Amino acid sequence: MRQLAHFKFFDTLSKKMVAGFIILILIGTVLLSLPWATPANVHTSLIDVLFTSASATCITGLTVVNTAAHWTTFGQLVILVLSEVGALGYMTFAVLLFNIMRRQIGLSTQLMVKASLNLERLSDTKSVMKYVVGLSLLFQLGGLGLLAIDFVPRFGWRHGLYVSLYHAVMSFCNAGFDVFGDSLQGFRNDPYVLTVTMILIIAGGLGFLVWRDVLLYHTRKRLTLNSKLTLLTTFSLFVIGFVLLLITERDLELLPTGMPWVNRTINTLFLSVTPRTAGLITMPTQGLQAGSLLVIMILMFVGGTPGSTAGGIKTTTFGVLMFQSIAQLRGRRDVEFSHRRFSQENINRALMLIFLASIVLTVATLILTQTEKIPKGFGLEYVLFEVLSAFGTVGLSLGLTPNLTLIGKIVIMMLMFIGRVGIFTSLYALSRRQARVNLIRYPAENILIG
């Protein structure tokens, strides 16, 4: 393994991170190809095994086969472990293993952890790692205990604890896999389970750095600009999404008649939370109104927070662009928030990220419209919904994924990978040369815009 670092492909952190996720996907593919991963006489094609492994590693949850019916307990546990490692980052577990073995962590390893968790300083690596592992255990074990209160009486001790563990991990990791067969549609009348699930989804999608900042607030008496922007954007999107879905799905015809208004409200709130890369659902997406699908697609595009278990363009990117637009409308030169000014580099990266994401999504949508069959009653949204779900590592589907062609599966896998690793990291990994400083700076000239 040490000799691999001398290969040209592994000469940058971006390439090492991309290679690490690819290796993890391949390991998952091998494990899911084993005979005891599926019931006897059940055949799974190589592309479907690879797709499942990629979906789990990229914590998406899009499936070409039913997780509950197609995979054995061993296969389901492989998916669970892949989702856990994919959510927290394989470097997190590598460092944890080094600590258990009492081995010194090298500089290159610390740099990869710093890059994978979006840390500002290398000195923060060890302290943040403790919070990542500690918070993950706290939320997932806490979720296991809370869900067991409902699931154990319902399913019995053995299966109840297994289901509680699986659902707690998948909810916190925002993976979207389930062992119920129909996601959470059987729990639409159970506000307790839905509330616990929403808490886990929000906790996982908020980001470890934000949680660390919040927990240290009692000593620092302040939050970083990143945490403030994240909390504001996250809360705003939840509220706006909830209100818009209340309007677009005001009749909630997909829910049983006579359902108490409290349960109907919680189902709508859950519908606004799950597009933030969770992928769990309490009602069939195919029956949602066109306006609801649009709201969900926007939420999937934004996604969660950098350094979290979520995908998408991230809440901070969305927040920076919103404040940049407000500053332009007010005629202000600087983009300000909470008595601080966003650097021009942040603004440029946000604009570039939106631009690149738009190109990737447009190309993917165009390809799928040519390779996939759109059923009657649907239009472009049938493909676009799946594309955004893959890019945002969400896992919601209008029914396209199980019927994808070979080319379609490859496209969706690439989108899931880019959504998890990040556009910038993916591009840097493909780049053959390092960025160079331009010694020549030409005169500026205005052009007509808009």
What is each of the regions a protein language model found here?
Residues 1-450:
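Membrane-proximal intracellular helices of multi-pass ion channels
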